[in-house]
Amino acid sequence: MSITVRVITPDRIVWDNVAEEVILPSSTGQLGILSGHAPLLTALNIGVMRIRPGKDWENIAVLGGFAEVENNEIKVLVNGAELGSKIDKEKARAEYERAQTRLDEVSKGDDRRKTIQAQQSWRKARARYQAAGGLVSV
């Protein structure tokens, strides 16, 4: 049996299809969803959502939000999302490396606001690079 999956951002629908399995980057860790899953509402971290519509997996970089699971349907409402297959892997790698360098630089200082901003930028860059297949998803 399949699950209907919808990934929605404020400006578009990123995914609207059925899947056999979904893995969400929830605030408490990776959360696997199969057909018949109990109703659930969970917060999502910045990370990679994995969808298996058939035998292959699709990656989606998600930028935080919520997911609701009910009656074999998953609604994912996120601040931003991008299909891994649409992300340029080399550009994502360069963005990730720049974000890592920036985080290393600001972490040495004592400006908490800049450190938090650099951490968020690094998380977003890591999610995009992972979704593109550049890093092993955790």
Swiss-Prot record:
Gene Ontology terms, MF aspect: ATP binding; proton-transporting ATP synthase activity, rotational mechanism
Q: What is its main location?
A: membrane
- Coiled-coil spans in chain: none
Cite a single Pfam family from the UniProt record.
Answer: ATP-synt_DE_N
This protein's UniProt keywords: ATP synthesis, CF(1), Hydrogen ion transport, Ion transport, Membrane, Thylakoid, Transport
InterPro entries named among the record's database cross-references: ATP_synth_F1_dsu/esu, ATP_synth_F1_dsu/esu_N, ATP_synth_F1_esu_C, ATPsynth_dsu/esu_N
Q: Does the keyword Glycoprotein apply?
A: no
Q: How does it sit in the membrane?
A: Peripheral membrane protein
Which top-rank group of organisms is this from?
Bacteria
- Enumerate the subcellular locations listed in this protein's record, separating them with semicolons: Cellular thylakoid membrane
State the similarity comment. Belongs to the ATPase epsilon chain family.
What is annotated about its quaternary structure and interactions?
Answer: F-type ATPases have 2 components, CF(1) - the catalytic core - and CF(0) - the membrane proton channel. CF(1) has five subunits: alpha(3), beta(3), gamma(1), delta(1), epsilon(1). CF(0) has three main subunits: a, b and c.
Q: Entry's HAMAP family? A: ATP_synth_epsil_bac (MF_00530)
PANTHER family, per this entry?
A: ATP SYNTHASE DELTA/EPSILON CHAIN, ATP SYNTHASE EPSILON CHAIN, CHLOROPLASTIC
Record's function text: Produces ATP from ADP in the presence of a proton gradient across the membrane.
Q: What is this protein called?
A: ATP synthase epsilon chain
Task: Give the species.
Answer: Microcystis aeruginosa (strain NIES-843 / IAM M-2473)
Q: What is the lineage of its organism?
A: Bacteria, Bacillati, Cyanobacteriota, Cyanophyceae, Oscillatoriophycideae
